[in-house]
Design a protein with these regions (language model features):
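N-terminal regions encompassing targeting/leader/pre-sequences
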Residues: 1-2
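A residue-level marker of the well-folded mature domains of exported/periplasmic proteins
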Residues: 5-16, 21, 39-225
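Gram-negative bacterial Sec-dependent N-terminal signal peptides
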Residues: 19-38
């Protein structure tokens, strides 16, 4: 039930042996037939929980997802945590009470949803992590980009523009596994230049919650240090 016009990694986790199978595929409408999830039934209720709809990036995802799901007869209920994990937990509980069939979650913090998602699973609700990994929880699907490759491409572009000099590394939220994979990919490319003394890393910090304000403050401090 996930829409994305990109190449993604689909990780299916079986309930018994917790084996992970990574399948690279193009997702244009739904990811149901080849997974443990059934196809959408007419009238299926989907709870779409977004981390922060104040950001345009997530607004576009919401619109594309909702359009595709409703075209197949599903009903989508969307809520935004606006960057607050406590709010998101309450919203998940609300979706459980509403009796949704599927939860699609962009987690604000993918490490603290285990208890509330256990409640969802007890009610027979399918749980999908979208773009960001949900850890320490029994989820049915995880759909994301090849985040390590994204990080490599970022670093390659920077090295093409500035092959020598001082670099300040700014990461996203330390609670988001994507940010860590971005950094892994970046370092795959940057480390040889660092070892060769072409690049000097003068700072390495992370912006909690992907906060633009936090990132601005960190960078301003870095530039004036």
């Amino acid at each position: 039930v996930l829409l994305h016009q990109e190449i993604v990694h689909l990780i299916t986790i079986t309930r018994d042996e917790k084996m992970k199978k990574i399948v690279s595929m193009t997702v244009l409408a739904t990811l149901c037939a080849a997974t443990s999830l059934p196809a959408l039934a007419d009238g299926e209720k989907i709870g779409l929980l977004m981390s922060d709809l104040r950001l345009e990036r997530w607004q576009k995802d919401r619109d594309l997802f909702t359009s595709a799901a409703e075209a197949m007869g599903a009903k989508v209920y969307t809520q935004s945590a606006n960057g607050d994990v406590t709010t998101q937990i309450s919203q998940i509980e609300n979706m459980i009470s509403r009796g949704v069939d599927v939860l699609v979650i962009v987690p604000e913090n993918g490490e603290v949803l285990g208890n509330v998602l256990a409640e969802a699973k007890a009610e027979g609700i399918k749980v999908l992590a979208y773009d960001r990994l949900i850890k320490f929880a029994d989820i049915d699907l995880y759909v994301s980009f090849d985040n390590i490759r994204v990080g490599e491409m970022q670093a390659e572009a920077l090295l093409n523009l500035k092959p020598k000099g001082n670099y300040f590394l700014m990461g996203g939220s330390p609670t988001d596994n994507n940010a860590k994979m971005f950094r892994q990919g970046q370092m795959n490319v940057l480390q040889p230049a660092i070892d060769a003394k072409k690049i000097n890393v003068v700072g390495d910090q992370w912006a909690m919650g992907w906060s633009a304000e936090a990132a601005l403050n960190i960078m301003e401090n870095g530039l004036t240090a």
